Amino acid sequence: MVGLLVTMGFVNKQQDALLCTALNVSVNQDNDLYFLDKLDIIQMIKDRGDSIVGQPKSTVNVSEIEKSLNSHSNIANAEAYMSIDGEMKVEVTQRKPVVRVMNLDGDSYYIDSDGTFMPLSNKYTAKVLVASGMLSEPFIKRYTYSIADIGKDSLLNATSLLDEIYAMANYINADKFWSSQIQQIYINKDRDMEIVPMVGDQKIIFGDTTAMDEKFKKLLTFYQQGLNTTGWWDKYSIINLKFKNQIVCTKK
C-alpha cells in the first residue's frame, strides 16, 4: 500500500512537471456562423497574459481561461482541458442569432437562440430576420437582461416588445416556408407587429403573438389562393390578421 502511494505521488509530480506541448483550438461553425475563428480564441488567451505552450501543466490555469472565454458575448459555451500528454484543448460553440434588432436611434444588436442579447460584430454579419420600427430600447441598457428576464419583470414586460419579437422570430426560423418568405418584422405606431415579405408590397398586420400559429395558418391559406389566382397579389395593399377567424384585406 505504501509502495502504491509512493508510486502515485511520483506519477502526479511527473504530470505536474510535464510541459504543455500545444494549444489546440476548435470553433464550431455550424449554421455558417463566423463571428469567431481559432485565431480569435488564441488571441483572447494571449490577451489575458496566459503563457500556455512550454509552461508546466500545473501553472496553466485552465478553469480561469475557460471562465474568461465563456464571458465573451459571442460564445455560447467554451470548454478547456489539458490532455494527459500535455496538450491543452479548447472547444468553442458560438452564439446563434435569430433576429437583429434596429431601434429608432440607429442602435442595433442581435437576440440569440437562447434569448440572450449580443452585440454586432465588425468581423461578420449574420443573415437573420431584422426587427425595426417603433423600438427605442438601446442595447447598452438591455444587455444585462435576457428574454427570460423580461417575462419575470412586470415593468419590462409591460414596456418591451422584444419578447414578442423573439417568439415570432423563433416561429419563422423553425418553418422552412416562412423563413424563405419573411425578411423583416416591423413595429408600427400602435405597437402592432407587421411582417415584411420577400415578395410583394403588401402591409401584413400581425398584431401580437396571441394565437400566432392560427394567424400564420390563415396567412398560408391566403398565400396558397394567391399563388393559384392571376393578379391576386396586386389587389390588396393591407392584409390584417389581428381578428379571430378572419383576414381583413384592404384593396389598393
Q: Which residues fall in each region the model found?
A:
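Charged, solvent-exposed interaction patches on well-folded alpha/beta domains
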Residues: 1-27, 48-56, 60-67, 71-252
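N-terminal export/assembly leaders
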Residues: 31-57
